């Protein structure tokens, strides 16, 4: 039986407004400190103006996963790229400006 993967959602506020991106999350390995968050989302949706650009700067933000919330520190930066239009995959990376109080985990 396949393990159910929780729905994943990122909400970000920038100078352009509020945006969210959500989908099914697949963990990827990370090494630097503070480690960037890298997510591969399938069946994703994008709401808001910020993610029409492939790079963004975070004023405030949060990650929602498995019923928990994780803050994204102010002044963090991020980028995204479509990995496969046929499979509806997107990669989102957030480069943290500092270590958050509550670190995102799987």
Curated annotation (Swiss-Prot):
GO terms for biological process: cell adhesion. Pfam families: Dicty_CAD. InterPro entries: Dicty_CAD. Belongs to the csb family. This is Uncharacterized protein csb family protein DDB_G0271178. It comes from Dictyostelium discoideum (Social amoeba).
